[in-house]
Structure formats: structure tokens, C-alpha cells
Curated annotation (Swiss-Prot):
Its main location: nucleus. Interacts with PTBP1, RAVER2, VCL and ACTN1. Part of a complex containing RAVER1, VCL and ACTN1. It comes from Homo sapiens (Human). It holds the Pfam family RRM_1. The modification Phosphoserine is found at S6, S14, S474, S562. This is Ribonucleoprotein PTB-binding 1. PANTHER family: OS02G0815200 PROTEIN, RRM DOMAIN-CONTAINING PROTEIN. It is found in: Nucleus; Cytoplasm. GO terms for cellular component: cytoplasm; nucleus. One of its GO terms (molecular function) is RNA binding. CDD domains: RRM1_RAVER1 (cd12663), RRM2_RAVER1 (cd12665), RRM3_RAVER1 (cd12667). The gene is RAVER1. Residues 59-130, 132-210, 221-299 form the RRM domain. InterPro entries: Euk_RNA-bind_prot (IPR050502), Nucleotide-bd_a/b_plait_sf (IPR012677), RAVER1_RRM1 (IPR034633), RAVER1_RRM3 (IPR034635), RBD_domain_sf (IPR035979), RRM_dom (IPR000504). Cooperates with PTBP1 to modulate regulated alternative splicing events. Promotes exon skipping. Cooperates with PTBP1 to modulate switching between mutually exclusive exons during maturation of the TPM1 pre-mRNA.
């Protein structure tokens, strides 16, 4: 495990103007971001050995040319001298995927069984190609091996993980490699680490072809120069500043598709050693009042390809956390909101900003172009206050009565004002020109009559809903007001009345359901003051002497006739004519002629 390296920061030095830059002056003018102390030879050797060991630790091999009926046990017997961690045999393709203990066993198995024969078939043994190798660049030079492992380990199981060090100084070159067991883990790591800030730097992550990566290609020949002066576009001056030791073969400033400068440049040298020397001399160099930061790019691609990759990576890092669609402007947000919400949003800084010192969602009022004039501000303020003073709509939305003019509203409310307890008012006064409420007569007797019949206390009277066409009397034939039908209050009233009617009609079938004006079917009452509907007898007795049945014998509501003629007339027409009542003389004669055998049988001798 690599040891921790202390970091010292040197303050930036002011550049000398109007003089030629000499070698000694250039060294004094350098202000690198991190000045690392020199390492002892033993520490350098340990770091280089760890990097080489991890680089060669490819323990997965691929065996081709196996017979079609080969079994898993035969592959185990073939590699019996090695320690197998995983083995999968594909009989259809004649291949086997094997994971050994380490890279040394994999190299030994390749040397032993490559181009050997199994059942007269030649085998091909090689390292498995991998597509889960990442190169993480632009790391801080002081980052240790342990810290790098902690950075990349949360995304999945690691196969290899190592930093690349300088062979001369043993210091980190600012990039490392991480190979995962699965490709989806590597893809997740690339997505999360790309553009992630780590200290003063922003990480760049690239896919790497493990087959083309050799020990010599671990060291990069390209340098990335950032922290250029604002608006710097002199490529020749940059090349001269970085050509003090070796001249680059490629030097270009980064520009976007719109021609805007990106603030960094990429240089490529002939060898990795030249690039390392140029980096050590140019890191922290003053140019145009800014101290350059020179770091190594990911190894492998040439300078031109690396420049395009860094431009794309920078764009991805800048768009990190943003959606696919562009951010809407203020006018689009206000158009999507309603007038009340827009006014409240605009005037929130004016109403609450002065008291608490807080700004609204859109910032301070002076920054809003819609509130420039004082007259407009005053008008918007008055309109906002009026909007806040308005009554909020209910659950069912705005009431239809709100759209009526004051003169068109009814004199009395539909249900009256509910008391604090939540109950209904005991009685509503009738309106002028309207019939009296019919709901109590439909629900049965009220007041003392209900208590006498055992029906419980009287229910609260309500204004009835409009009666159907077939049940309307002469007093309800006029058209109803438009606010009696269709409003949320009328829906509530009709539903409540229907429930009360259903519950009370089952108890009050013996009482008159009719009012004093006329019958339920439009018939006038009889001569005795009762409706024809009450002439039906129950059990041979009059309905006027009927008592409430016991609770265990519920009564059902009798079906109403469908014609205006009372149904008792048809029934009485079918009854036979009764005999005349006998006179008292006839009764006495009949009594005298009746034998009295019971008198003789009841007497006993004395």
C-alpha cells in the first residue's frame, strides 16, 4: 500500500514584465498547484512494482477449439495444476471461460496449453478480452492508491485497480485504471465519475482497450493545459512557453462547435519521457497573468483525438445534473401559471421581502423588468390584495351563484346557514309566493303525533327538492328557479332528502303521507277529511286505530297504485252481498229451540 504524501502549496508569484524569461527566472516564476516532496528510492520501487503487478494481473483466460461433447469436468482435469475460481463451458461454441487465481497462473496456462491438442483437436488459449476497463484522469497528484480504490470501489467488484507513477520521481501522474468484473458496473462508474469535482479538479473518465494497452503505453504523451488567461487565443505563445525543453508535435486550443474557446489546450510530444519533462517544467508557469496548470491526459489516443474527447467530456460535465430539455424562461413559467398565481409570485418580494429580508422565487423586485414603473407596481399591488381578499372556492369548485347578479340571488339560502354543531336548522320560513314545505308530510307525522305513534323525535324540516312531473300538484306546476337545479347545493339537498324519505317511509305507512291541500296522486280527500288511500283496512280494523308494530316485525311499504281509481273499489265490487240482520224476536226463537244437554250432564245427585 502506498504511503500518504504531504502537500505544500506555494503562493503565486507576480510575473516580471518587459524582460526575457531565462531558465532561472522561469523556475522562480513557477507556482504549481501542488508541490510534492521527493521520495526515497525504496518508496519509488514499491510503487512501480505495485503498478506492474496490477497491470499484469489478468487472470481470465479463454479456451477455444474444444470438442462438442466436452464436459466441465474435463476442463477441470485439463487445468488440474492450477487453481480455478470460475469455469463455464459453452458446448455449442466449443469454448470455455476460466478464471484462475492470479495473472501468473493465467500466463503459465497460456504458455502450457496454447496450440495443444485435446481429442485430436487443437486448442487456442489466450486472455479474455475485457470491455470493463476505465481510465480515470485529472486526479490530484497527491491522491494515494488507497484513496483511488475508495473512489472507484463503490460501483462494483474490482478486477484491477492501480495508479500510474513516474519512473523517475515515483510521483503519481494524475490518472489510474480500474477494471470491473462486469461491464454494467464500469458503465455506472463512468456515468457517476465523469465531471465529478475532486478537490480543485474535475475528473475525466474514458473507456480503454485492454488489448492495446502495454507497459510502455501506460505513460501518456499528451498534456492538458488549463487555467489559461481569459480570452487567450495565441497558440504560438502557448507553444513557445511549453517548448523550453522539448517542442510539441501537436498544440491546439479547445474550441466548441460555435467557435467559442473552452479555456484549455492539448499538446502532444514525441515520447512519454519528453511529455513528462515538459510537464515538470511548465506546471505553474506564468502566462499572461495566470499560472498554467499542466497535467497528463489519458494514455493511448493521439493529441487530436484526445482534444475532441476532452471537449465532449467538458460538455458532459457542464450539463451534469441537467435535464434533456432546455430550462424555461420566466415568461414561459408565468404563462403556464394562472393570473392569481402569477401576481402572487411577482408581488411576493414586495409583500414579504421588506419584513424578513428574503427575496422571492424570481429574485429581488428591481431585477424584474415587469415592475419598472411605480404606477404599474401600485396597480399590481392593489390587484393582488383584492385577489387575496376573495373567497376561496369550495371542494366542488366555484358556486354557480357567484356568477349571478346581486338582484338575481334568492332571498333565503337553499339550506340556510349551518350551526356550529354541524346540524341542520329546525325550520326554514317559507318564501313569499311559494307553497309550504312538503317534506314533513312525505316523511310522516311530525311533533306530538310522531311521539304518540312511537316513531321517535321529529326530524328537522328541509326545503323539498323539485317534485317529478307525475307527482306535482297544482301548487307546484310553476317553473322552478334556475338555481334550484344543477348547483352543488341542490345535489346535496336532494341526496339528503332521499335518504331521509327512505328511512321514514318504512315506519310511517299507517300515517297520512299527504298534505292538507291534496292527495299524493292528485285526488281530492274524501268527505271524512282523509284521503282515499287510507281506506285500506289492515286486519279488519280501521287505520285510525292502528298502532305501531313491534320492532321485531318490520313492515314493508305497500306498492302505490298506478291509476287514479282507488284499488279498494275493485275489491269491494267482487265481495258477495251480506244477509240482513235478524230481529230480536227471531233471535229469541232460535235460542229457545236450541237443546240444552249440557245442563243435565253438569248436575250431580245429592
Amino acid at each position: 500500500m502506498a504511503a500518504d504524501v504531504s502537500v505544500t502549496h506555494r503562493p503565486p508569484l507576480s510575473p516580471k514584465s518587459g524582460a526575457e524569461v531565462e531558465a532561472g527566472d522561469a523556475a522562480e516564476r513557477r507556482a504549481p498547484e501542488e508541490e510534492l516532496p521527493p521520495l526515497d528510492p525504496e518508496e519509488i520501487r514499491k510503487r512501480l512494482e505495485h503498478t506492474e503487478r496490477q497491470f499484469r494481473n489478468r487472470r481470465k483466460i479463454l479456451i477455444r477449439g474444444l470438442p462438442g461433447d466436452v464436459t466441465n469436468q474435463e476442463v477441470h482435469d485439463l487445468l488440474s495444476d492450477y487453481e480455478l475460481k470460475y469455469c463455464f463451458v459453452d458446448k455449442y461454441k466449443g469454448t470455455a471461460f476460466v478464471t484462475l487465481l492470479n495473472g501468473e497462473q493465467a500466463e503459465a496456462a497460456i504458455n502450457a496449453f496454447h496450440q495443444s491438442r485435446l481429442r485430436e483437436r487443437e486448442l487456442s488459449v489466450q486472455l479474455q478480452p475485457t470491455d470493463a476497463l476505465l481510465c480515470v484522469a485529472n486526479l490530484p497528484p497527491s491522491l494515494t492508491q488507497q484513496q483511488f480504490e475508495e473512489l472507484v470501489r463503490p460501483f462494483g467488484s474490482l478486477e484491477r485497480c492501480f495508479l500510474v507513477y513516474s519512473e523517475r520521481t515515483g510521483q503519481s501522474k494524475g490518472y489510474g485504471f480500474a477494471e470491473y468484473m462486469k461491464k454494467d458496473s464500469a458503465a455506472r462508474a463512468k456515468s457517476d465519475l465523469l465531471g465529478k469535482p475532486l478537490g480543485p479538479r474535475t475528473l475525466y473518465v474514458h473507456w480503454t482497450d485492454a488489448g492495446q494497452l502495454t507497459p510502455a503505453l501506460l505513460h501518456s504523451r499528451c498534456l492538458c493545459v488549463d487555467r489559461l488567461p481569459p480570452g487567450f487565443n495565441d497558440v504560438d505563445a502557448l507553444c513557445r512557453a511549453l517548448s523550453a525543453v522539448h517542442s510539441p508535435t501537436f498544440c491546439q486550443l479547445a474550441c466548441g462547435q460555435d467557435g467559442q474557446l473552452k479555456g484549455f489546450a492539448v499538446l502532444e510530444y514525441e515520447t512519454a519521457e519528453m511529455a513528462e519533462e515538459a510537464q515538470q517544467q511548465a506546471d505553474g508557469l506564468s502566462l499572461g497573468g495566470s499560472h498554467l496548470r499542466v497535467s497528463f491526459c489519458a494514455p493511448g489516443p493521439p493529441g487530436r483525438s484526445m482534444l475532441a474527447a476532452l471537449i465532449a467530456a467538458q460538455a458532459t460535465a457542464l450539463n451534469r445534473g441537467k435535464g434533456l430539455l432546455p430550462e424555461p424562461n420566466i415568461l414561459q413559467l408565468l404563462n403556464n401559471l394562472g393570473p392569481s398565481a402569477s401576481l402572487q409570485l411577482l408581488l411576493n418580494p414586495l409583500l414579504h421581502g421588506s419584513a424578513g429580508g428574503k427575496q422571492g422565487l424570481l429574485g429581488a423586485p428591481p431585477a424584474m423588468p415587469l415592475l419598472n414603473g411605480p404606477a404599474l407596481s401600485t396597480a399590481l399591488l392593489q390587484l393582488a390584495l383584492q385577489t387575496q381578499g376573495q373567497k376561496k372556492p369550495g371542494i366542488l369548485g366555484d358556486s354557480p351563484l357567484g356568477a349571478l347578479q346581486p338582484g338575481a340571488q334568492p332571498a333565503n339560502p337553499l339550506l340556510g346557514e349551518l350551526p356550529a354543531g354541524g346540524g341542520l336548522p329546525p325550520e326554514l320560513p317559507p318564501r313569499r309566493g311559494k307553497p309550504p314545505p312538503l317534506l314533513p308530510s312525505v316523511l310522516g307525522p311530525a311533533g306530538g303525533d310522531r311521539e304518540a305513534l312511537g316513531l321517535g323525535p321529529p326530524a328537522a324540516q328541509l326545503t323539498p327538492p323539485p317534485a317529478p312531473v307525475g307527482l306535482r300538484g297544482s301548487g307546484l306546476r310553476g317553473p322552478l328557479s334556475h338555481f334550484y337545479s344543477g348547483s352543488p347545493t341542490s345535489y346535496f339537498t336532494s341526496g339528503l332528502q332521499a335518504g331521509l324519505k327512505q328511512s321514514h317511509l318504512s315506519k310511517a305507512i299507517g300515517s297520512s303521507p299527504l298534505g292538507s291541500g291534496e292527495g299524493l296522486l292528485g285526488l281530492s280527500p274524501g268527505p271524512n277529511g282523509h284521503s282515499h288511500l287510507l281506506k285500506v283496512r289492515a286486519g279488519g280494523g280501521d287505520m285510525q286505530g292502528w298502532e305501531a308494530p313491534a320492532p321485531q316485525r318490520p313492515l314493508t311499504r305497500p306498492a302505490l297504485p298506478s291509476v287514479s281509481r282507488p284499488h279498494w273499489a275493485a275489491r269491494n265490487a267482487a265481495l258477495p252481498t251480506c244477509c240482513p240482520r235478524p230481529s230480536p224476536a227471531q233471535k229469541a226463537a232460535m235460542w229457545a229451540s236450541t237443546p240444552r244437554a249440557s245442563a243435565a250432564t253438569t248436575r250431580t245427585p245429592t
